[in-house]
From Swiss-Prot:
Gene name as annotated: ispH
Essential cofactor(s): [4Fe-4S] cluster
Organism (species): Synechocystis sp. (strain ATCC 27184 / PCC 6803 / Kazusa)
Residues that coordinate or bind (2E)-4-hydroxy-3-methylbut-2-enyl diphosphate: 69, 158, 223, 290-292, 352
UniProt entry tagged with the keyword Iron: yes
Reactions the enzyme catalyzes: isopentenyl diphosphate + 2 oxidized [2Fe-2S]-[ferredoxin] + H2O = (2E)-4-hydroxy-3-methylbut-2-enyl diphosphate + 2 reduced [2Fe-2S]-[ferredoxin] + 2 H(+); dimethylallyl diphosphate + 2 oxidized [2Fe-2S]-[ferredoxin] + H2O = (2E)-4-hydroxy-3-methylbut-2-enyl diphosphate + 2 reduced [2Fe-2S]-[ferredoxin] + 2 H(+)
Name recorded for this polypeptide: 4-hydroxy-3-methylbut-2-enyl diphosphate reductase
Iron-sulfur keyword on record: yes
Transmembrane segments: none
Length: 379
């Protein structure tokens, strides 16, 4: 953990925490979310990956995917000569992994098929899967034993959901309430079977039949999805099956377990508190492919707060310029992005973002504001 403390923790962040999550410098007030950044599962996974290199200094090391959705952390592993499995035409290529190699499974987990392949090659496996993800796997396995179809709230191409679905029997992945409603409408009223299958083409188990496989359901989720939406989806399916089969038969048709990750929930709750403040803008820090970070940005956008999503302080500058990712769009450049005069900036970060990265972003914001009067005079 010594390396973790040196590389990822921040004295400035500790000071802000102790000052009621508030920092005031000149024209800038920074309000930090009361829950943000590295969660326990991420910290555990990164520490285990580092310790694996120390424990196997001369061995060839692999990791089946990004350890977490943070570019700086993954780059650090590459510098430690941890090899990432190549993806060729959308498929992982394990041909380079030899018998006896050491293979790290990331925080999101790995599919049953990948684990079997690595076992067959007699690899040494270091499993850093977050226990909250394992909890979801246990839930879908219970669905499978009871011959229930798993309705998984998640993104069908996200590593965690790919792994979770591999533990399920029959499954269907829904991205949001709109897709859940589409499924529930089919349960109650039927519809065009082929149209349904085409719509969910990449999001169901092999041989899925909506006329046969939507009778008994269990709900699970990708742990980083928006808590409130997962809860609404669960209630929608319960209400739909209650309407179709009645209260006496409901328990034979519907299973639900709480698989919402505590850390995800805490960060979202803290964000809902933060957006109630009088903010000039919101800065959300985390990997662009990070699901939990994107959901934090959604909360700011839904509350009408101007927000920028960046993955590191390198996106800021030179000058009063930022390269950021608006919700649902590609990278854009915003210049100027910090308004003149007194501003209050809300700051949060995803569960895969180290405190050091948050500190770097804050320091750049402060530097821009300190230089602003000079820039204005020069202009």
């Amino acid at each position: 953990m010594g390396v973790m403390n040196t590389e990822y923790q921040s004295h400035l962040i500790q000071e802000i925490r102790q000052n009621n999550y508030r920092l005031e410098r000149g024209d800038v007030t920074i309000l930090l979310a009361e829950a943000f950044g590295f969660c326990w599962g991420v910290e555990r996974a990164v520490a285990m990956a580092y310790e694996t290199r120390q424990h196997f200094p001369g061995d060839r090391l692999w990791i089946t995917n990004e350890i977490i959705h943070n570019p700086s952390v993954n780059q650090r592993l590459r510098e430690m000569e941890v090899n990432f499995i190549d993806v060729v035409n959308g498929e992982k290529d394990f041909s380079g992994v030899a018998k006896g190699d050491v293979v790290i499974l990331p925080a999101f987990g790995a599919s049953v098929e990948e684990m079997q392949l690595l076992n067959d090659r007699e690899c040494t496996i270091v499993d850093t899967t977050c226990p909250w993800v394992s909890k979801v796997w246990n839930s879908v396995e219970k669905h499978k034993k009871k011959e229930h179809t798993s309705i998984i709230h998640g993104k069908y191409n996200h590593e965690e959901t790919i792994a979770t679905s591999s533990f399920a029997g029959t499954y269907l992945i829904v991205l949001n309430m709109a897709e859940a409603q589409k499924v529930c409408d089919y349960i109650l009223h039927g519809g065009d079977r082929q149209e349904f299958l085409d719509y969910f083409a990449n999001a169901h188990s092999a041989g899925f039949d909506p006329d046969q496989d939507l009778v008994r359901l269990g709900v699970a989720n990708q742990t980083t999805m928006l808590k409130s939406e997962t809860e609404m989806i669960g209630k929608l399916f319960e209400k739909t099956l209650l309407q179709k089969y009645g209260p006496i038969e409901l328990n034979n048709h519907f299973m639900s377990f709480n698989t919402i990750c505590d850390a995800t929930q805490e960060r979202q709750d803290a964000m809902f508190d933060l957006v109630e403040e009088d903010l000039s803008l919101m800065v959300v820090i985390g990997g662009f492919n990070s699901s939990n970070t994107t959901h934090l940005q959604e909360i700011a956008v839904e509350h009408g707060i101007p927000s920028v999503h960046i993955d590191s302080g390198d996106r800021i500058g030179p000058g009063n310029r930022v390269e950021h990712k608006p919700l649902g769009k590609d990278l854009e450049v915003l210049e100027p992005w910090l308004p003149a005069g007194k501003i209050t900036v809300g700051v949060t970060s995803g569960a895969s973002t180290p405190d050091k990265v948050v500190e770097e972003v804050m320091k750049k914001i402060l530097a821009i504001k300190e230089a602003q009067p000079v820039l204005e005079i020069a202009g």
